[in-house]
């Protein structure tokens, strides 16, 4: 399967926080196909263990997260429209005028759009449009009233997830889709598992994907406790700022070196290891000072402290229906992660942990 087809398959899957099943099923099928036996944590994270033959080998964890941002129905109005609570961070300005799918408890899929006030209805009112609260945005399934919505099985607690088509940009260098945060990571771990399938390593690897990252790094807390790694590598996507006049995160500039974010500071040993590995592997990198967090923020606080970092890329307009990301950035990150994993051994892990 070509890279674009893999990206398309993963990004078009609809799976939000607490409803990661469709992505988990996809990952499980691919893991089994590659000859691995996946196991699960208590919240639904999926991982495989590739054990080393080296006695007391260090345990290295590589984790994506499966969930994308979405919404949950909080109320159904008399006119048959819905109001919601967000699952993950949303800018209200990107929500209106979009298409979604509502998933009922029985698995029925209902097309839904978000309503915006047409300019015609504002003329002569003297009203200046305001930024709406998420709780005020109209989600409309075109039902006549609440009773008809109920007949179709719609209820409070149902999930609403963006619906889009993944496409290639005109120049062929970029892809436009939803959910690259974090189907990027999901594709990275599958590609890594395929790369490592016939390799023996001096470290034991735990590779997979967490749940509920977008609502507070919840899955990482559980999985890191369960698998007890010596080092933790999150693979995640962050927002690019290049179209907003900021050099912090630019498309086409390679994988990110994330020395700092609000929930995590990279330890000196890890920083030195990443810089040396990137230089040796001739990987294109960019320093990224993040304003948000990744699962590394939860993992590094687990089990008495786990040196952690994030192997990432940036994308424009994340947490929306239309994200733009660079194909070569993905390939640079892929090369970097492979170099990292194949460089690790007992001595190197001890060096990284020697703060």
UniProtKB/Swiss-Prot annotation:
Cofactors that this protein relies on: a divalent metal cation
Catalytic residue positions: 213
Gene Ontology terms, MF aspect: glutamyl aminopeptidase activity; metal ion binding
Positions of a divalent metal cation 1 binding: 65, 181, 236
Alphabetical UniProt keywords: Aminopeptidase, Hydrolase, Metal-binding, Protease
Manner of cofactor binding, per the entry note: Binds 2 divalent metal cations per subunit.
Keyword Disulfide bond included in the entry's annotation: no
Stretches of the chain forming a coiled coil according to its record: none
Gene3D superfamilies: Peptidase M42, domain 2 (2.40.30.40), Zn peptidases (3.40.630.10)
EC numbers on record: 3.4.11.7
Protein residues bound to a divalent metal cation 2: 181, 214, 319
GO BP term, pick one: proteolysis
One Pfam family this sequence matches: Peptidase_M42
Domain of life, per lineage: Bacteria
Catalysed reactions listed for this entry: Release of N-terminal glutamate (and to a lesser extent aspartate) from a peptide
Listed PANTHER family: AMINOPEPTIDASE, AMINOPEPTIDASE YPDE-RELATED
Membership in a protein family: Belongs to the peptidase M42 family.
Stated name of the protein: Glutamyl aminopeptidase
Organism in which the protein naturally occurs: Lactococcus lactis subsp. cremoris (strain MG1363)
GN (gene name): pepA
């Amino acid at each position: 399967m070509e890279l674009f087809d893999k990206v398309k398959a993963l990004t078009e899957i609809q799976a939000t926080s607490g409803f990661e099943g469709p992505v988990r099923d996809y990952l499980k099928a691919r893991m089994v196909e590659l000859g691995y036996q996946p196991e699960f944590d208590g919240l639904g994270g999926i991982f495989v263990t590739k054990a080393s033959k080296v006695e007391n080998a260090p345990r290295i964890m590589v984790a994506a997260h499966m969930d994308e941002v979405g919404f949950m129905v909080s109320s159904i109005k008399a006119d048959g429209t819905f109001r919601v609570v967000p699952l993950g961070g949303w800018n209200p300005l990107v929500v209106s005028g979009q298409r979604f799918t509502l998933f009922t408890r029985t698995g029925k899929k209902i097309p839904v759009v978000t309503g915006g006030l047409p300019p015609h209805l504002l003329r002569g009112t003297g009203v200046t449009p305001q930024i709406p609260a998420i709780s005020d945005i109209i989600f409309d399934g075109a039902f006549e009233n609440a009773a008809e919505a109920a007949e179709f099985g719609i209820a409070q607690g149902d999930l609403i997830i963006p619906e889009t088509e993944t496409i290639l940009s005109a120049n062929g260098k970029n892809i436009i889709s939803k959910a690259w945060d974090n189907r990027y990571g999901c594709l990275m771990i599958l590609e890594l598992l395929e790369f490592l399938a016939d390799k023996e390593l001096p470290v034991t690897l735990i590779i997979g994907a967490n749940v509920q990252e977008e609502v507070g790094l919840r899955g990482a807390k559980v999985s890191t406790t369960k698998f007890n790694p010596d080092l933790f590598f999150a693979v995640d996507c962050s927002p690019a700022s290049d179209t907003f006049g900021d050099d912090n995160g630019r498309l086409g500039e390679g994988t990110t070196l994330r020395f700092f974010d609000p929930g995590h500071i990279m330890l000196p040993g890890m920083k030195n290891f990443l810089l040396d590995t990137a230089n040796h592997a001739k990987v294109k990198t960019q320093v990224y000072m993040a304003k948000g967090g990744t699962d590394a923020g939860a993992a590094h606080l687990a089990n008495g402290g786990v040196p952690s970092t994030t192997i990432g890329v940036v994308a424009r307009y994340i947490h929306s229906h239309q994200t733009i990301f660079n194909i070569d950035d993905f390939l640079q990150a892929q090369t970097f992660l492979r170099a990292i994993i194949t460089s690790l051994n007992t001595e190197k892990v001890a060096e990284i942990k020697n703060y």
